[in-house]
Amino acid sequence: MKDCLFDCDGLMFDTERVAQDMWREIGRSFGVEIPDDLFVAITGVKDTRALTPYFETVPHLQDILDASRKKRFDLDFWASFYPDGLNKKGLVALNQYLDENHIPCCVCSSSKKEYVETLLRTVSVPLHFDSIVGGDMVEHGKPDPDIFLLGASILGVDPENCLVLEDSKMGILAAKRAGMHSCFIQDTIKPDDEMRENIEFEKEDLLQVIDLLEELQ
């Protein structure tokens, strides 16, 4: 592998569980209970097209979406849940390994670039990424491959030499469509049969990705 492309939420940072709690809290403020399958539909996607059926069944959904977006950019909000930081196990060690071995890496997130930069500021140890690609930088989000292809292009690496690290179904599908290798690290989403068919590698955490990279060299 000549580079690593990282998803952000749920992969680098333990934000998905907090986001679900946040959605539930905001929903209740509107007198609405958020269904569990809505979280599966929204995880790893750029826009709200995947939520189209829910706009008919979940009252005030647009208001809930708007309120959640505002909170996502609030560092104090994240710090209230994780005073010691949001980073997932192995993030710092893997990032240092990539840096020491001169392997380029890029964050490729469905979220806006500004939001990714907000989360990076929560880490006590500075992380090195050669670039950040946000969902606001491409026309089509995951499961389309645009985000990963742009990341590879910025790093100057051919798709077949890229390893994508993902925790979502849409991200795994996007990696497959980009012609890249993928490693799934489970967070809140349990793989279904379709997802299993597209997962090339699977590890418990980012720390184990170091061993995978050693094997692939």
Give each language-model segment a name.
Residues 1-2, 96-99, 112-113, 117-217:
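Asp-based, Mg2+/Mn2+-dependent phosphohydrolase catalytic module
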Residues 18, 46, 86-90, 111, ...:
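Short beta->alpha linker loops
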Residues 20, 24, 36, 47-52, ...:
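An amphipathic alpha-helix signature
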Residues 26-27, 46-61, 119, 151-152:
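Helix-loop "lid/cap" segments that line or gate small-molecule binding pockets
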Residues 54-96, 101-103:
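Metal-dependent phosphoesterase signature
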